[in-house]
């Protein structure tokens, strides 16, 4: 019995040691100068009965912004890239895969240099009057933006 337990422990221990590390894992923490965490709060979309987006707004907080208002009237879906106020932050609204809406965020850091990333926003939609629907963010959301190329699309 002791031999069986020892053999099993050795076998499972060896297989755990032989397991490959996750791709791209070097063990070192990521360089904080190579990415930015963007917190999204108070995300709201007003859409018509036909699904057209009439208005989108949210607050963005990142390295160079705290509660920056981002908004657009009749942005379309997907939207063009829209500047948040007079800042170097921009966004585009699109359809998500898991949730109804996704945000692509951009932070211009210099001439043709910046961070970019996309994340989905979990919303709940309800009647908003005059045949419209109001969709509001349900959970705190952080989108990580960086200068790395996007991962290949899944087949």
Swiss-Prot record:
Subunit structure: Monomer. Interacts with Arabidopsis thaliana NRP.
One BP term from GO: symbiont-mediated perturbation of host programmed cell death
Recorded GO CC terms: extracellular region
Superkingdom of this protein's organism: Eukaryota
Disulfide bond residue pairs: 70-84, 125-135
Pfam family, one: AltA1
Subcellular location(s) per record: Secreted
Domain notes: The N-terminal region (1-98) is sufficient for induction of SAR of N.tabacum to TMV infection. The C-terminal region (99-155) is sufficient for eliciting HR in N.tabacum.
Domain AA1-like, first and last residues per copy: 33-148
Annotated InterPro entries: AltA1 (IPR032382)
Species whose genome carries this gene: Verticillium dahliae
Coiled coil stretches, renumbered: none
Function: Effector protein. Elicits a hypersensitive response (HR) in tobacco plants (N.tabacum) and cotton (G.hirsutum). Boosts systemic acquired resistance (SAR) to tobacco mosaic virus (TMV) infection in N.tabacum and to V.dhaliae infection in primed cotton seedlings.
Protein name (Swiss-Prot/TrEMBL): Effector protein PevD1
Alphabetical keyword list: Disulfide bond, Hypersensitive response elicitation, Secreted, Signal
Span of the signal peptide: 1-18
């Amino acid at each position: 019995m002791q031999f069986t337990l020892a053999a099993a422990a050795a076998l499972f221990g060896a297989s755990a040691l032989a397991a490959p590390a996750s791709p791209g894992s070097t063990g070192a923490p990521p360089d904080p100068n190579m990415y930015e965490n963007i917190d999204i709060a108070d995300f709201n979309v007003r859409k018509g009965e036909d699904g057209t987006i009439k208005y989108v707004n949210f607050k963005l907080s990142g390295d160079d912004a705290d509660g920056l208002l981002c908004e657009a009237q009749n942005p379309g879906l997907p939207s063009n890239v829209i500047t948040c106020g007079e800042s170097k932050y921009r966004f585009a609204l699109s359809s998500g895969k898991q949730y109804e809406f996704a945000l692509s965020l951009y932070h211009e850091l210099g001439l043709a240099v910046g961070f970019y990333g996309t994340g989905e926003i979990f919303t709940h939609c309800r009647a908003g009057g005059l045949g419209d629907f109001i969709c509001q963010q349900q959970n705190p959301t952080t989108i990580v933006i960086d200068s790395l190329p996007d991962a290949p699309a899944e087949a």
